[in-house]
Amino acid sequence: MPENVASRSGPPAAGPGNRGKGAYQDRDKPAQIRFSNISAAKAVADAIRTSLGPKGMDKMIQDGKGDVTITNDGATILKQMQVLHPAARMLVELSKAQDIEAGDGTTSVVIIAGSLLDSCTKLLQKGIHPTIISESFQKALEKGLEILTDMSRPVQLSDRETLLNSATTSLNSKVVSQYSSLLSPMSVNAVMKVIDPATATSVDLRDIKIVKKLGGTIDDCELVEGLVLTQKVANSGITRVEKAKIGLIQFCLSAPKTDMDNQIVVSDYAQMDRVLREERAYILNLVKQIKKTGCNVLLIQKSILRDALSDLALHFLNKMKIMVVKDIEREDIEFICKTIGTKPVAHIDQFTPDMLGSAELAEEVSLNGSGKLFKITGCTSPGKTVTIVVRGSNKLVIEEAERSIHDALCVIRCLVKKRALIAGGGAPEIELALRLTEYSRTLSGMESYCVRAFADAMEVIPSTLAENAGLNPISTVTELRNRHAQGEKTTGINVRKGGISNILEEMVVQPLLVSVSALTLATETVRSILKIDDVVNTR
C-alpha cells in the first residue's frame, strides 16, 4: 500500500537509492547531443566531398525562383544550401571564413573538418573526455603548422613563373580549367598592377573590378587599364571623345519637383507656357555651367526619386557635344573616382574644373553584335586599379568564370600576404599525417592517442583526390605514405596523369596561407563542436 501511494504522488525523491538513475540519464544527454552535432556536420562535409580537385564533380543548384547555378566552389555550394541544423551551419560559416581569409581551399577546409569529426566520434566512443580531445587537437595543430612552414619554400613576387603556376593550380579544378592559360596571366597582371611588389603586404581586391558582359566566349575576356562600364552612352551622336574631361554628378539634370503635398494650379495656356519656359531656362543654365568647366564626358548617378536626365537636358548636352553616360550605380562611384581621378559632385555650385578627371580616350565599343561597352582609357592621374571584362555564352558560364577569376586573384593575394609556397596534390596532408604520427609517439597517455587520430584524419584529402580521379584510394595513399617515409616530401597525386609523382616538378603548387588557414580554421571549428553538450531552443 505505501508503495502505491508513493507511485501515485509523483516521482520519488532523489534519495541515495535512486540518485544513480537520474544522474546516469543526465550523463547520457550531452553524449547524444555531441553525436547528433557531429553527424549533422559530417553530412555537410560528405555532400561536397566529390567536388574536390581537378577531377571533382560539379553541383547544379536550383534556388526557389528556379535560377540555376553550376559550380564546384565549396563556399558557393554551401552558401546556397538550405542548412537547418545549427552544427551543420557552423561548417557553412567555416567555408565562408576560409573564403574571406584565403579565397581558395573552401572545399578542403570542410572535408578536413568532417574527417576530424569522424576521428572525434571514434575517440568519444572509446570513452575519452571531449576536453582532452580538444586540447590534444590544439597541440597537434601547433605542431602541424610548424611542419607546413618547414615544407614551404619562399617566393619572390618578381618570380612571375611561380605566381602563374599557383593561379593555374587554383583554376585547374574549375569548370573553366581549359582557359587557365588565358585567365592565369590575366589574374597575375591584374594583381601586379594594383600593388607595389616591393612594399605590399596585402591586396585590396576592390581595386580589381570584374565586369560581366553576356556574349562571345571566355576567350574574349580582357584586362583593361582604366574603366569599363556596361551602361550605354545616352546621346547617340557622340561615341568617341579624345582628351576627355570627365565629370561625375550625383544630382539630377531635370526640372525640380514640388514636395509631395504641394500642387500648382495652371488656369490658362499662358501660365503653362511660363512653367515650360522656366523649366527650359533652369535646365539650360545647369548645362551651361557644366560646359563652362570644360567637361566633355558626363557620368550621372542613378536616381530613384525622378529622372536623372530629362530629354530636354540630353538635347542641350548633345548640342554642346558632351558625351553622357547615365544610371551609374552608387556602389561603383568609389571605384570610378579612384580610377580616373574625378570627384563626385552633389550640387551644381560645386561643379568646378578641379572636380574633373582627365583621360586620353572615352569611347563606346561595339562587341560584334552582343551589345556595347563604355571604356575610358589612358587616365592621366590613374589610381592603382584595373578592370577585368568577363565574357561568356550564357549566364552560368559567366558567373562561374567570375568565381574562378576571384579564386585565382585570392591565391595571388595569399602569396602577397605570406610569401611562401607549398606543394599541392595532397603532399602536405600526407607529410602532416606521417610527421604527426611520429610526434604522437613522443607523447604519453590519452594525448598520444588523440594526436594519432588527428594525424590519420589528414589522409582524407589525398584519399578523396584519388577517389575523385578514379584511382584506388587505399593503394594510392599507401604508396604516398611509403614515398614520404623515404623522405620524398613533395610527392603527391598527379591527377592529370593519374598517378603519383613529384608535384613540385609538375608545378602543382598552392600558397602556404591556404593550407595554414584551412588547418587552423577546421581545427577551431571541430573544437567548438566538441565543446557543445546541449542545444537550448529559445523563442
UniProtKB/Swiss-Prot annotation:
Binding site for Mg(2+): D104
Annotated catalysed reactions: ATP + H2O = ADP + phosphate + H(+)
GO biological process: binding of sperm to zona pellucida; chaperone mediated protein folding independent of cofactor; chaperone-mediated protein folding; positive regulation of telomerase RNA localization to Cajal body; positive regulation of telomere maintenance via telomerase; protein folding; protein stabilization; scaRNA localization to Cajal body
Family annotation (CDD domains): TCP1_delta
A single MF term (Gene Ontology): protein folding chaperone
PROSITE patterns, per the entry: TCP1_1, TCP1_2, TCP1_3
Binding residue positions for ATP: G53, G105, T106, K174
Positions that bind ADP: G53, G105, T106, T107, S108, N172, S173, K174, G425, Q510
EC number from the UniProt entry: 3.6.1.-
Cellular-component GO terms for this entry: cell body; centrosome; chaperonin-containing T-complex; cilium; melanosome; microtubule; nucleoplasm; zona pellucida receptor complex
PTM-bearing positions, type N6-acetyllysine: K21, K288, K302, K319, K326
Record localization: Cytoplasm; Melanosome; Cytoplasm, Cytoskeleton, Microtubule organizing center, Centrosome; Cytoplasm, Cytoskeleton, Cilium basal body
Region (Disordered): 1-28
Swiss-Prot/TrEMBL keywords: Acetylation, ATP-binding, Cell projection, Chaperone, Cilium, Cytoplasm, Cytoskeleton, Disease variant, Hydrolase, Magnesium, Metal-binding, Methylation, Nucleotide-binding, Phosphoprotein
Keyword Ribosomal protein found: no
Top-level division of the source organism's lineage: Eukaryota
Gene3D superfamilies in the record: GroEL (3.50.7.10), GroEL-like equatorial domain (1.10.560.10), TCP-1-like chaperonin intermediate domain (3.30.260.10)
Residues with Phosphoserine modification: S36, S184, S202, S444
Assembly, per entry: Component of the chaperonin-containing T-complex (TRiC), a hexadecamer composed of two identical back-to-back stacked rings enclosing a protein folding chamber. Each ring is made up of eight different subunits: TCP1/CCT1, CCT2, CCT3, CCT4, CCT5, CCT6A/CCT6, CCT7, CCT8. Interacts with PACRG. Interacts with DNAAF4. Interacts with DLEC1.
Record-stated family: Belongs to the TCP-1 chaperonin family.
Function recorded in the entry: Component of the chaperonin-containing T-complex (TRiC), a molecular chaperone complex that assists the folding of actin, tubulin and other proteins upon ATP hydrolysis. The TRiC complex mediates the folding of WRAP53/TCAB1, thereby regulating telomere maintenance. As part of the TRiC complex may play a role in the assembly of BBSome, a complex involved in ciliogenesis regulating transports vesicles to the cilia.
Linked pathology: Defects in Cct4 are a cause of an early onset sensory neuropathy knowm as mutilated foot (mf). The main clinical features include ataxia, insensitivity to pain and foot ulceration. The pathological features include a severe reduction in the number of sensory ganglia and fibers.
UniProt-recorded name of the protein: T-complex protein 1 subunit delta
Organism: Rattus norvegicus
